[in-house]
Amino acid sequence: MKSPNAFSALLDIYISPSKAFNGVEHAKGWSWLAFITISLVSMASIYIFYSTVDMQFLINEQFAAASVDATIGEQKMIRQSIEQNAGIQVWISMISIVLGTAIIAAIMAVYYMLIAKLDPESEHSYGAWYGFTIWTIMPNVVLSLGTIALVLSASTDQISQTAVFNFDSINQLVVGLEPGSAFYTLLESLKLSSLWGIGLGMVGLKCWTNFSTNKALLFSALPTLVIFGIWAIIAAM
């Protein structure tokens, strides 16, 4: 079975991802709708946060995180830089999330295209794999909606940026390390939405190739395993 249209695929990617990937496989333009959806919801979460948060509180939080190991002179420069850019942070963040999504998809599309060559019957183009990657990033929509809900339901405007944007991180949910810890940034970057994306990648690879479940899971998880494995080794040194 496959999704009959792009709008159905936007729902199916969450409740029946194989239908979404089967529909996307030979469709034209569907992935643009997914990219636009991710971008708009992500930008909305950023805009709502910056429109709500106490900027001085945010500046202090960002300064505390960025100046853990800094000298007094470096701390002054860091605070000055943060304060100078405070007014444009919202626009920088919104542009960055869109460009970041596009760049990550571009890199991962190359990876998927290369590993798909292990299946002699797979003949998908780079553009097809680019669209494929966009659909594996769709959990970011749920993440952004969660951020919006946390911001709008907050009882104060002194809202932690890390708490609302990384609420699904392993560090926030389980470990609870403080800034300055060797593994803090790593565990803040490892999120449930990322693991969800790996699962979607596995389902998609099974739909688009003849890979077994185990092989599809391995290939979907491999980039994350390599990146976080190297990161963990460096953090432990």
PLM features: what roles do these ranges have?
Residues 6, 19-23, 27-142, 148:
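Selected alpha-helical membrane-embedding segments in polytopic membrane proteins
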Residues 12-13, 49, 64-69, 117-124, ...:
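Short, exposed beta-strand "edge-strand" segments with a Pro/Gly-rich flavor and a Y/T-containing core
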Residues 15, 109-113, 198-200:
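A generic alpha-helix surface/boundary motif
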Residues 1-15, 85:
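Short, membrane-interfacial amphipathic segments enriched in basic
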Residues 127-237:
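Hydrophobic alpha-helical transmembrane segments and adjacent short intramembrane/lumenal linkers
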Residues 2, 92-93, 179-184:
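Short juxtamembrane and helix-loop transition motifs at transmembrane-helix boundaries
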